[in-house]
Amino acid sequence: MSVQNVVLFDTQPLTLMLGGKLSHINVAYQTYGTLNAEKNNAVLICHALTGDAEPYFDDGRDGWWQNFMGAGLALDTDRYFFISSNVLGGCKGTTGPSSINPQTGKPYGSQFPNIVVQDIVKVQKALLDHLGISHLKAIIGGSFGGMQANQWAIDYPDFMDNIVNLCSSIYFSAEAIGFNHVMRQAVINDPNFNGGDYYEGTPPDQGLSIARMLGMLTYRTDLQLAKAFGRATKSDGSFWGDYFQVESYLSYQGKKFLERFDANSYLHLLRALDMYDPSLGYDNVKEALSRIKARYTLVSVTTDQLFKPIDLYKSKQLLEQSGVDLHFYEFPSDYGHDAFLVDYDQFEKRIRDGLAGN
């Protein structure tokens, strides 16, 4: 099944939270399962930073949630009707910096406006309106997707029954913002970046590859890397190149990333992570969080090096103090932050129960 596309905000532009407007927004989306007659089994999936509209494939390819989704699995396509879309600012079909600006006939590049999570959620809401979905059984997201799910619960508190937030906090930490800054600088200082207007020339591949390598280290754990590589070396490794196997692994991940992601989208979405503030548009964070009516599942991985346990615990406190019906779980995983994508055994029950409201 191929990705579906729809153009939204073609008559009335989207007013962005930080100023500016966007019109004629293409949204790439995918659906799985069947919407029942009562229309009460719809679930919205919000993807993480570099995800897309296709968490699952039925033709042998690997989606980013391939092992979690399907008939009888945690994301049960026999039970639920899933909707997943690429986020605003992305590069997998939905309008972003690499898209053609209808006013100029050229890619937006440096002219793409600054976006925040609230803008992403507005586009998702417009998609559901287009699809005729007026209520959701649940919204689920991990990492950056968890921030989207959280904002949905604030901005549209009557729209869903359940929220499932995996490995994501209410605020991004100073350390995590620091990681993102280093990654952005790697891209911006690539000689080919050209202020973001590189589409008619050579893209900033070296900078983006380096940024991805650093990002990978924040998604993994020392224990996992030690088990996989230890201090093993490559027989053909150069002294100043990929001498250790872990270096070769990171180089491979950096190069592989270039095949599927745009540098400008990476910069914009990293900044949206940094900037996430659920109180934007409200007087304070407690006023914002107190709007939440959905049953809320929050899952923390104690070995997560990006959204650390202390950040999830602070989020737990804020949600509880705001009167949210919170169900909090934490456990270790060798996979660290990426556990929500790969550690099915640990997450299966929490996802099943969270979607069902059990």
From Swiss-Prot:
Pathway: Amino-acid biosynthesis; L-methionine biosynthesis via de novo pathway; O-acetyl-L-homoserine from L-homoserine: step 1/1. Keywords: Acyltransferase, Amino-acid biosynthesis, Cytoplasm, Methionine biosynthesis, Transferase. It is an enzyme of class 2 (transferase). The keyword Transferase applies. Changing residue 306 to R: Can no longer use acetyl-CoA as acyl donor, but can use succinyl-CoA. It is found in: Cytoplasm. GO terms for biological process: methionine biosynthetic process. Transfers an acetyl group from acetyl-CoA to L-homoserine, forming acetyl-L-homoserine. Utilizes a ping-pong kinetic mechanism in which the acetyl group of acetyl-CoA is initially transferred to the enzyme to form an acetyl-enzyme intermediate before subsequent transfer to homoserine to form the final product, O-acetylhomoserine. This is Homoserine O-acetyltransferase. The gene is metXA.
